[in-house]
Amino acid sequence: MVKTVLILCTGNSCRSQMAEVLVNHDLGPDVRAVSAGTRPQPKVADGAIEALKLGGMSTAGLYPKDVDAVMNEHIDLVVTVCDNAKESCPIFPKPLPAIHMPFHDPHGEPLESFVRVRDEIRARLIPELKQR
């Protein structure tokens, strides 16, 4: 059975989007990631798109989503990737296991910062999810 992981942050424009793509790329088909934000931005950050493309990953169909849009999906685990999302994490219809794994927010920084965060997500989050 496929495990579904919700990756949650505030804007759903940088870290959670990169984490969604990395999890689906590295752990699919056993794990399916979806991402959302507590206050989603209008679009995915250009730096996040570029960092993912540089890593050879598809960015087709990425867009910021409000956590309410995924609230009724089957979720096995919630991963918060920023402190604000942890603090304002919504109450789900059923209790869910959750982990908090914060990453630096590269929004507004050079592409190198996005690449660094992408690599850190891969180095820390992927092994954690493999163990679960």
Regions found by a protein language model. Give the residues of each.
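Conserved small-residue
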Residues: 12, 52, 78-79, 121
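Mid-chain, well-packed structural core segment of small domains
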Residues: 62, 68-93
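Phosphate-binding/catalytic loops
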Residues: 86-132
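Alpha-helix boundary/capping detector
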Residues: 49, 77-79, 105, 124
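Conserved active-site segments centered on acidic
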Residues: 1-68
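Structural signal for conserved beta-strand scaffold positions within catalytic alpha/beta enzyme cores
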Residues: 35, 80, 99-102
